[in-house]
C-alpha cells in the first residue's frame, strides 16, 4: 500500500492548527518541500527549518498565528486534498477553479513544478490539482 505524503502533510498541519500548536514537524521529501515553500511564500507559514534526526530529514514548520481580542487564530482556515492516488484530478489552465473568488489558493503539480493557481494561469499551463487552501 502506497503512502499519500501530501495528504499526510495537510492532515498534520490541519490537526496542529485545530490544536493551537505553534510548531509542527513533518517528514521531508521533494514534493513536501516544494509545497511548504509555496505555503511560506503565500504567507500561510511563518518559518520553515530543515532538521536532521536519526538518519532522516524533517521540516519544522512554524504556523502563522494572529492575535485578536477574542484570542488567537491562524491564517489557514481550511485545507482540502483534491487529487488522490485512486482518483487523479487534472485541469487545463482555463478551467482551474477559483477558491472564494481568488482569496484562497489552489496548489497544482505541473510540468513546471508545484505552482499556485495564479502562477499556472499566468504561464498558461494546467496540471494535477493537489489541494485547496482557504
UniProtKB/Swiss-Prot annotation:
GO cellular component terms, semicolon-separated: plastid; ribonucleoprotein complex; ribosome
Compartment annotation: Plastid
GO biological process: translation
Recorded superkingdom: Eukaryota
Pfam families with a match to the protein in the record: Ribosomal_S8 (PF00410)
InterPro entries: Ribosomal_uS8, Ribosomal_uS8_CS, Ribosomal_uS8_sf
Molecular function in Gene Ontology: rRNA binding; structural constituent of ribosome
Keywords: Plastid, Ribonucleoprotein, Ribosomal protein, RNA-binding, rRNA-binding
Family per similarity comment: Belongs to the universal ribosomal protein uS8 family.
PANTHER family: 40S RIBOSOMAL PROTEIN S15A
Oligomeric form and interacting partners: Part of the 30S ribosomal subunit.
Function: One of the primary rRNA binding proteins, it binds directly to 16S rRNA central domain where it helps coordinate assembly of the platform of the 30S subunit.
Name assigned to this protein: Small ribosomal subunit protein uS8c
Gene: rps8
